[in-house]
Amino acid sequence: MKNITILGATGSIGTQTLDVIRREKEELKLVAISANKSDKKVIEIIKEFKPKYAVLMEENAFKIVEDFCIDNKIDTKVLKGMEGMIYISTLEEVNTVVTSVVGMIGLVPTIKAIESGKDIALANKETLVVAGELVISKAKEHNVNILPVDSEHGAIFQCLRGNKKEEVKNIIVTASGGPFRGKKKEELIDVKPEHALKHPKWNMGRKISIDSATLMNKGLEVIEAHFLFGVDYENIKVVVHPQSIVHSMVEYKDGSVIAQMATPDMKLPIQYALNYPNRKESQIEPLDFYKISNLTFEKPDMDTFLPLKLAYEAGKKGGVMPAILNGANEVAVDLFLKGKIEFLQIGDLLQECMNKFYKSMEATLENVISVDKEVREYLGKKYDI
């Protein structure tokens, strides 16, 4: 029996993780959850799974859930804030922590979980982007597995199993291309949030949907891949594959290319990470090759989708530059969703902050938190938020 903590249990990945646990109750047990402010969803999870702990970040939501548990004599202990997240990430009885919260908020709980010897099922891209070197070194120090919970890195992880790192020539990360694949800059001038949120293949949260539309999501995945698999940026390629059947590939020195293919469904990489190193009976629709008419691959347009280009630049620069990129992007996406900036301004703001805030500093926990704060305060004052 594996005991699981889910950070971000009410979001897209968290909800699908609950689906996996629901179907594997004999082998997976939900011990603790966290959420931001979705008190109604948390109450439903408590009623069904009866976790020992539930954490709410928002004060009012915390009180609602706490009162519900007291009034209904439910044993779930309700905690709040970052302190609560760290507590449930370091519980002695927990084997695996699923980090599916969005943004920098997942960084400290993830590091604390690693230091407590927990395997990490990582769906929070920002953790590796801003502090990849620190996270990977901590994982090695504490003999912890970092198991990627996204289709691309989960695919690469599988393609690398049983092979030697020195035999790898290139990692090929596939991208659907998002809702604006094939568009040029002039066609994206009047894009509204509702257009950018309509992803052609995946059902995702609002922030990651915008990242997919700008291709920033793929840029973050490139930086993640660098840290997860120890491959230079020159050997990490992005290929647009609109059918989303090939989830990523590894090219070896002898010319062989190993690809992982499956129906596009996030439950597969979640299930693989939770059950690693074993494979379980599929919870998704099997791939039917007779129904696949064609598979196509294209080069990404980095001029139109500037954030992907900037992610490569930030990754190669190293140090705190990925943290600057990430902090600026989180604020820029929020500004776009609130109608305060245009779609194409997202890339412009990333470029502006990378130029303004870069310092030759090691990516320690203190440094990345400090520079992230500087970027957010600057953009907050600029746009009065």
From Swiss-Prot:
Coiled-coil stretches noted in the UniProt entry, renumbered to this chain: none
Signal sequence residues: none
Gene Ontology molecular functions: 1-deoxy-D-xylulose-5-phosphate reductoisomerase activity; manganese ion binding; NADPH binding
Keyword Manganese: yes
The reaction(s) this protein catalyses: 2-C-methyl-D-erythritol 4-phosphate + NADP(+) = 1-deoxy-D-xylulose 5-phosphate + NADPH + H(+)
Binding site for NADPH: T10, G11, S12, I13, K37, N124, E126, G205
Amino-acid positions noted as binding Mn(2+) in the UniProt annotation, renumbered to this chain: D150, E152, E221
This protein's UniProt keywords: Isoprene biosynthesis, Manganese, Metal-binding, NADP, Oxidoreductase
Cofactor(s) needed for function: Mg(2+); Mn(2+)
Annotated 1-deoxy-D-xylulose 5-phosphate binding sites: K125, S151, E152, S176, H199, S212, N217, K218, E221
InterPro entries: DXP_reductoisomerase (IPR003821), DXP_reductoisomerase_C (IPR013644), DXP_reductoisomerase_N (IPR013512), DXPR_C (IPR026877), DXPR_C_sf (IPR036169), NAD(P)-bd_dom_sf (IPR036291)
EC number: 1.1.1.267
Biological process according to GO: isopentenyl diphosphate biosynthetic process, methylerythritol 4-phosphate pathway involved in terpenoid biosynthetic process
Pathway: Isoprenoid biosynthesis; isopentenyl diphosphate biosynthesis via DXP pathway; isopentenyl diphosphate from 1-deoxy-D-xylulose 5-phosphate: step 1/6
Highest rank taxon of the organism: Bacteria
Similarity remark: Belongs to the DXR family.
Functional note: Catalyzes the NADPH-dependent rearrangement and reduction of 1-deoxy-D-xylulose-5-phosphate (DXP) to 2-C-methyl-D-erythritol 4-phosphate (MEP).
Protein name according to UniProt: 1-deoxy-D-xylulose 5-phosphate reductoisomerase
Name of the coding gene: dxr
